[in-house]
Every structure is written in C-alpha cells, then in structure tokens.
Amino acid sequence: MDKKPLNTLISATGLWMSRTGKLHKIRHHEVSKRKIYIEMECGERLVVNNSRSCRAARALRHHKYRKICKHCRVSDEDLNKFLTRTNEDKSNAKVTVVSAPKIRKVMPKSVARTPKPLENTAPVQTLPSESQPAPTTPISASTTAPASTSTTAPAPASTTAPAPASTTAPASASTTISTSAMPASTSAQGTTKFNYISGGFPRPIPVQASAPALTKSQIDRLQGLLSPKDEISLDSGTPFRKLESELLSRRRKDLKQIYAEEREHYLGKLEREITKFFVDRGFLEIKSPILIPMEYIERMGIDNDKELSKQIFRVDNNFCLRPMLAPNLYNYLRKLNRALPDPIKIFEIGPCYRKESDGKEHLEEFTMLNFCQMGSGCTRENLEAIIKDFLDYLGIDFEIVGDSCMVYGDTLDVMHGDLELSSAVVGPVPMDRDWGINKPWIGAGFGLERLLKVMHNFKNIKRASRSESYYNGISTNL
C-alpha cells in the first residue's frame, strides 16, 4: 500500500504536529511542486518539504500527539477525526491471481539414456530441413565416389536412425571425402544457407543483416547535427554511427571556418545591421531597463487578460522582466516630446522574456526590435513603406494582412508564409492617455530570431537564439 504524501495527510485532517508533539490547527496552506506553505491558527508559519517519508508525515500517519496548542482551538470533532485510524478503501485493492507453475516429471535416466557412440565412428548430423538425406555410403581409402553416382534417399522426418557400425568407414589419415560433390543447401524457410565441410556435415554461412531502423532519440540527434545545406537522407538505411560520424566531421569543419574567417554571431551581426538601417534614416537608438515595474504591465492592460498574465516572469510583487519594449518606449516618447522637434523617431533592440510554449516558433528569451514615429507623417502608407524598405534591406519576402490584439486593438501583421514576423500599429489607441501621449504615432515590432530563421532557412528557431547548444545554427554538442 502506497504511503500518502504530506499534503494529502494535511488536507484530510487539517492539523499539523510539531517536532515536540504539539498539535496545531491549520488555518491555510498552499502546495507548490516540492514545498508546502502552512499558516497555523495561532499565527505560526512554516515551510516544509512535501514528502511521504518525512518526520511530519510519519507523525500524522501514526495519529499520536503529546499536547494541543492552546491558541489553535482544535475542536473535538477535528481531534476525533485525527485519532480515528481510517484505513484505505479495500474495495479499490487489486488482487492478482497467480497460478502455481506446473511441475514437469523428470524422465528416469534408464529411459532418457542416449546410446554411446562407437569408437572411430563419425557422429550423425541432422539437417535442419524437413527432408534430410540418408546416411552416406562409406567410402574406402582407395576409392572415391564420383558426384554423378551418389544417390540420396529421403528419410522420414519423425525418425532418425543411427548409422550402424558396419556402414561407417573408420577414420584414418588416408580417408578423403570430396567437398566439391556436396552442393550448398538451403533450409525450408530459405533464410539460412549451409555449406558442407569435411565429413558431409552442414556449416551455416553468415548472411549480412540490414541496418536496424533509427530510434527516435537517434533521429533527434541526427536532426540536431544537420545543417540546411546538408543533402543527407535519414531514410537511406545507413547505420546511425556512420551518419553521426559524417555529420560531426562536417560541423567541426564549419565551426573552424567561422573561427578562421567571420567570427561574428548571426544575432549580433543582425543587430548591428538593423541599427545602421534605422540610424541612417533618422531614428534615435534607445537602451531601456530590462527590469520594469509591474505597474507598467497593468497600464498595458495585460493584467486583465489571464493568458498574457501567465506569461510574465515576475521577480517579486513589484517588478518583472519586460515581456515587450513598448512600455519604456511610451515613456521615452512622452519625455522626448518636450525637447525634440517633430516628428520624433526612436527604436530599440533588446531582450524580452515571456513564458511561451516550447516550440519551433517561440522562445522564452528572445530579441525584439521596436521602432516608432510620433507626430507628423504617421499614416499607414508611411508605416508600410518603412516595413518594406526594412525587409527589402534584409532580403525577406513578406505580405501584410489585417489582424487585431488585446493590447492595441486593430493591427497589421507582417507574414512570411505562415510565420508572423511582425505586428504593426497605427495610433492613436485608447491606452495612449494612460502614458501621457496625445499625438498620432506609428510603430512595429519584429522578433530577430524569426528574421534569422527565415534568412538562414533554419527549421528550428532555437538555432537562431541565445543558446549554448547552437552557434550560428551549428550544433555545439560535438
């Protein structure tokens, strides 16, 4: 019978026993993956491990205590419930009936005795096929039977008669049997081949087996080593070790070439290219904090959406890791509006964090580009023109489709096939007044890892991310 974990015992009794045997009434408790947070009626708080075999679990399971806490007000009903030993429901017990093994009768040695082979007599070999040849006619030392005159009579499959001593030629140095007269035979199933050795007995010829099918872990390993430029099929029947060795050799060569020539990380190189593009077009580069107040998240309206709220990496009750760049850019637009001429154009490239589902298109740590313009010229036509110039600069095909989201309302999605590259907005939007913005604006956000995935034809977005497992899409697990 399995022992109940500590959280089950606490939920069943509502009581806690201290190390000194004092019984407490539990006011509230919360269970995490490994810990239990307990608050007593007397105000005492503690954190314990959720275990089956800890001291507290054993004490609650044995229903014994020394005294009751005076401030916890343990009722008689709770006490009686704790003292009553409730066994597990026996109706749920599974009973497995195991039959005793049958005892085989051992044949007496007098019945199971095998005849002793005669001296100077070759043992009889039975072929594995159902039709087996009769004993071969003995050949003397002075004569050799030609292959054309030898005859073979099939023997019954159920009986095998031992060769009599009178029909077996004695073994001597002058006795020879021609092996060329014995053709290779095949078993009834046609899978095992035999060749005949001296004495007319079959010897199996090994048949080379095909390479076994690749397991899922082997396929995952090979796919991690594959590069988009590799033309290697995993269904070719090539053994795993041979495929792995070939791919490892190629990846080491690729890393050596990068180290000798380029020495630039794809993500860092793309950041520098994007920075040059926007700086040359009059945009001001921004670097804002990664740790932001939870108040910014509430102002963006994320706390009202349950799914988006679950994606926030909270540091404590007051701060979190930024899930987007927009809050800080809002603040910069409001402050720079007091000093800079119209229009104000800014952009930022930096890491963001969300508890995204693990997949080929999502990362929990990713790099965002946000650009925005506030004031004159903030039209949809100008926004689409900036997006077109930017993606043409990177050499990426795209199309723009209409969409909507909870934060901004109506948006423009920039798509590359089925992959969303960006979400763009033409302001103003209702939340602008919460940030002190009262002018029209346009803006868009791009995920740099998705841009790299398209540019280098990566099948998995992790190859383009901040990772210790990949460098420029090349596996480092070599």
Curated annotation (Swiss-Prot):
Its main location: cytoplasm. InterPro entries: aa-tRNA-synth_II, aa-tRNA-synth_II/BPL/LPL, Phenylalanyl-tRNA_Synthase, Pyrrolysyl-tRNA_ligase, Pyrrolysyl-tRNA_ligase_C, Pyrrolysyl-tRNA_ligase_N. Belongs to the class-II aminoacyl-tRNA synthetase family. Keywords: Aminoacyl-tRNA synthetase, ATP-binding, Cytoplasm, Ligase, Nucleotide-binding, Protein biosynthesis. Pfam families: tRNA-synt_2d. The keyword Hydrolase does not apply. Residues 133-188 have a biased composition (Low complexity). Residues 122-132 have a biased composition (Polar residues). GO terms for biological process: tRNA aminoacylation for protein translation. Transmembrane segments: none annotated. Catalyzes the attachment of pyrrolysine to tRNA(Pyl). Pyrrolysine is a lysine derivative encoded by the termination codon UAG. PROSITE patterns: AA_TRNA_LIGASE_II. The gene is pylS. This is Pyrrolysine--tRNA ligase. It catalyses: tRNA(Pyl) + L-pyrrolysine + ATP = L-pyrrolysyl-tRNA(Pyl) + AMP + diphosphate. Its EC number is 6.1.1.26. GO terms for molecular function: ATP binding; pyrrolysyl-tRNA synthetase activity; tRNA binding. Disulfide bonds: none annotated. It comes from the Archaea. It is found in: Cytoplasm.
